[in-house]
Amino acid sequence: MRLTVPGNLLLLGEYAVTEEGGLGLALAVDRRVAAELEASSSLVVEGRWGERTVHWNRESGEASPLITAIVETWREQLYSQESTKAREAGEPAGRIIVDSSAFFEGGRKSGFGSSAAVTVALTCALLHLSGFSGSRLLHCAARLALLAHRRAQGGRGSGYDVYASLYGGFGCLVGGAEPSWQAVELPWLPPLYIFRGPASVSTPNSLHSYERWKGSNPREWRSFFEESNQGVRRFLQADSWPQARRAFTASKELGLRLGELIGVSARIEAHDSLVPGLHKALGAGNELGIYLAEDPPDEPALEPVVVAPEGVRWQS
């Protein structure tokens, strides 16, 4: 049995989506994590992260904090409290190989949300071992993968990346302790391209800077939060790209201002041939940029973004 899970990007709603009621527009990217299930006398997981391979079992849980968080969440939720039937059946055994090599380029992560995609893939594989299938598996995976990913991130995480990888396509996430995901259609959206920023950016450090600024400036934060949500709503309510373009540009400018306030720049240099108002930084910082191309770009540094309409994909 084999399954694949797409990557993800957050197009709009940086930082605000981590808040209760914060909106974020996300999408699934057709660069996939693969998971294969094989027979085994015990539960073992092999993780292939680019050029690095980790081996996880009960005795070597420290080999991968992410795998440990996923397995422990599955174990606690299903075999500690899910049902008497599950506890009596005992934990199933199997060998699971999770490969995220497609998310690495020259030893550097691509920025397509590999940790969330790995979390979804391994969670679905574990649930399959537990006898789940179809909509029941998908529903349970949404809950467990979110818990596991937050656990691996120290309790944080909006969930946009988990849900985008799980469901595929475009979606609007409403952030909070129990986030919600609503699929959206954007038929007028121009082709998307990404390009690299100057260096990797630590998302936890960026969020720490944001939280520190928020605590010291509650009134300014409230203004930012409301403006961010308004920008996402206007983008989603647009009937055409010219309407949505204004909301996109406003969201970009808001991100630039916030970056200056919290000390984490959202300013990203792009090639002179790109229209300035059509590109912005993605995520917390300027590690990755996105360009919405009204005309075919002639710039080799740009990488086309292929949207994955399908989330988890199973293969026999």
Model-derived regions: residue spans:
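C-terminal nucleotide
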Residues: 2-10, 16-18, 26-29, 34-80, ...
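Short, low-complexity, charge-dense intrinsically disordered segments
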Residues: 81-88
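Short secondary-structure junction motifs
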Residues: 91-93, 157
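Conserved phosphate-donor
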Residues: 95-97
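DPxDG-like acidic metal-binding loop motif
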Residues: 110-134
